[in-house]
C-alpha cells in the first residue's frame, strides 16, 4: 500500500476503535505497527507489547514515546463538527499517531542525520509503566519527546512526582463509651497531620511547587475482637521533594502503631527551557503560525520514569487539551491534531539541521 493511502485522521480513528485498557494493548499495538510499515517505517511489536517503529540511519538518536493504553470506559468513536471523539483521542493515542505521521514525513536529509525510534508504550495508566521501563535500558537517545497532550503550541518541561501511601491501624476492640480513639480515628488524626504538614510546605509556592494530597480510600473492617482501619492516599510531589524525602516526613508524623506501605514512587522532573530540543520546538511552532508556551504539569507521565535513565534533553509534546483526559467527552480537534503533526515534523527537521555538521551514518 502506498504512503498516501493512509489518512492520519482515519488512521487515528481506527486506533481509537480498538479498546486498549492497561494490560490489553496487543491488538492496537499490532494495528499501529502495521500502519507504520505501510508508511514506509520499520514497524513491529516488542516483548512488552509496545508498538515500535524506526526511521532514518543518522548518528543522532531521537526517541518519540507516547502511550497506547487508556483508562477504562469506552466513548463512542465519532467524527463530529471537526472533532474526533474517543477514549485516547488526547491521552494519548492522538499524540502518538501524530508522532508516527511526523516521522513518516521526514525529509531524506533529516533521515540521514537522525535515527528516530517510535515507542507506543504500554501500561502508562497503570503503576507498572511496563512499556517505558522495558525500553529504558534498551534505547540510548540523544533527545526524547514524550507524547502527551500539551496543545499544539505548548511544550511541557516537567511533571510532578508521585507517592502512593497505604496506612493501617489494628487494635483491640473496646466499648464505644471508652475514652480512647478507635482505629479509624487514629488514622484520621494522622491524615490531618499530613495535611497540615503539606499546607505548611505550600506557603508561597506556585501550584507546580506544592505538595498535593488526595485521600483515595478509607475502610473500617468490622470485627468482634480487633478493630482494623485502612486508608489509601497519594501525594503529588514537586522537584524539591523526591519520594524518599517525602517518606521520611510521612514516617516521622506516624505513631509507631500505624503501619505504612509506600509504592508507585515516581521522581519529579523539570527540564531546562533552553536546549537544542526546546529551540527546535519553538522554531517549529512559530513556523506553523503559533506562539510557543512552556508548561509544567501537576500529574505524572512516562517522563518521570524515563528521565532518571535518560539524562538528555527531554520534553513532552502532543496535540490535544489535557483537561479532557479521562473524561466521558474526550476528543481532539482535527485541526489541532494536524497542526501537531506539522510541529513534530518541523521540530525533527530543525533538530536535524542543528546537527548538520556532524558525520552522517
From Swiss-Prot:
Pfam family name, one: Peptidase_M20
Keywords, alphabetical: Amino-acid biosynthesis, Cobalt, Cytoplasm, Hydrolase, Lysine biosynthesis, Metal-binding, Zinc
UniProt-listed SUPFAM superfamilies: Zn-dependent exopeptidases (SSF53187)
Positions in coiled-coil regions: none
Cofactor binding mode and count: Binds 2 Zn(2+) or Co(2+) ions per subunit.
Role noted for this protein: Catalyzes the release of L-lysine from [LysW]-gamma-L-lysine.
UniProt protein name: [LysW]-lysine hydrolase
Taxonomic lineage from the root: Bacteria, Thermotogati, Deinococcota, Deinococci, Thermales
